[in-house]
């Protein structure tokens, strides 16, 4: 995808409609462990490929003691992995395990970009377990259709105590099946 476009939940939008018209040279790459001190709030970036190859998660550490993990689309109660620009389930599982190792015990609330904006604690562990179940062929595989694309929902959406879910493509479970490079 060209840098002048970005994916907006199934539609490609001209980036200039959403970002300032600064020259690209003035932007800096966001990298793993990049940290920003905003005066009382420190934000640290972590890579979490899955929903997209460039998905990032942010640890927000406020001086009052609140610590948040902002997962956005990278990991939430209904994570999309079925699109062509998503990684395989196996790669997503690796990303989640690496992220968990880096941030475990460093946050007390999970924020995302959908629904109420708040996730239950234990989300990363639940998504890792769902990845394992997908790889083992032990999921509900409920058909899912959105915006001309289709995938399979791993767990029955009405399942009790469900903490996270994944929509995946059955032909992109293993690393070797990833389309993006």
Question: For each predicted feature, which ranges?
Answer:
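Active-site HxH/HxHxD metal-binding segment of metal-dependent hydrolases
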Residues: 1-37, 66, 77, 133
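Core dinuclear metal-dependent hydrolase active-site scaffold
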Residues: 32-63
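Structural motif
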Residues: 41, 66-68, 109
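Active-site metal-binding loops of divalent metal-dependent hydrolases
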Residues: 50-52, 72-74, 81, 113-116
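Conserved beta-strand hairpin/beta-sheet module of binuclear metal-dependent hydrolase folds
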Residues: 57-76
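Short, solvent-exposed loop/turn segments at secondary-structure boundaries
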Residues: 81-86, 122-123
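Soluble or luminal CAZymes and related metallo-dependent hydrolases
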Residues: 87-95
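Accessory terminal helices/loops
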Residues: 94-181
């Amino acid at each position: 995808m060209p840098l002048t476009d970005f994916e907006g939940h199934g539609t490609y939008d001209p980036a200039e409609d959403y970002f300032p018209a600064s020259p690209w040279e003035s932007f800096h790459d966001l990298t793993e462990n990049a940290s920003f001190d905003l005066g009382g709030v420190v934000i640290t970036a972590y890579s979490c490929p899955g929903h997209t190859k460039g998905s990032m998660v942010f640890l927000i550490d406020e001086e009052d003691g609140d610590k948040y993990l902002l997962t956005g689309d990278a990991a939430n109660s209904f994570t999309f992995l079925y699109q062509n620009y998503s990684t395989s389930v196996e790669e997503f599982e690796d990303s989640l395990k690496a992220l968990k190792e880096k941030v475990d015990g460093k946050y007390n609330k999970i924020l995302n970009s959908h629904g109420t904006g708040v996730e239950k604690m234990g989300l990363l562990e639940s998504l890792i377990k769902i990845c394992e179940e997908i790889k083992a062929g032990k999921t509900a595989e409920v058909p899912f259709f959105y915006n001309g694309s289709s995938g399979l929902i791993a767990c029955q959406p009405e399942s009790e105590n469900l903490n996270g879910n994944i929509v995946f493509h059955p032909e992109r479970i293993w690393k070797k099946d990833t389309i993006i490079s």
